[in-house]
Amino acid sequence: MAITKKCFAAFVLILLFVMPFVYCSELDNTSGFEIKQEDKCYGPEPCKNGYEGCLFFCVRIAYYLYGECTMKPDHQKHCCCVTK
């Protein structure tokens, strides 16, 4: 079964036209101008060592981008880690 040049060219053009739409449909529902980040807060223990303790906790234990100590309603600083 021989594939002619016209059939091959049509197949390649269809692939080039369809592939961008398949790739774009797999992305999340962001507008393109924002990065989806999520915070996850843990107890106050990592913040007892200051900012560096929270940062070390988030990177080493939880594998997040970074961490920061934030004041919560219970008037204690909790270690909140930010994900991608």
Curated annotation (Swiss-Prot):
Residue ranges spanning the membrane: these are none
Chief location category: secreted
Q: Which residues form the signal peptide?
A: 1-24
What intrachain disulfides are recorded? Answer: C41-C81, C47-C69, C54-C79, C58-C80
| Any one annotated GO CC term | extracellular region
The keyword Cytoplasm is annotated on this UniProt entry: no
Q: Which family does the record assign?
A: Belongs to the DEFL family.
**Name of the featured protein:** Putative defensin-like protein 114
Organism (species): Arabidopsis thaliana
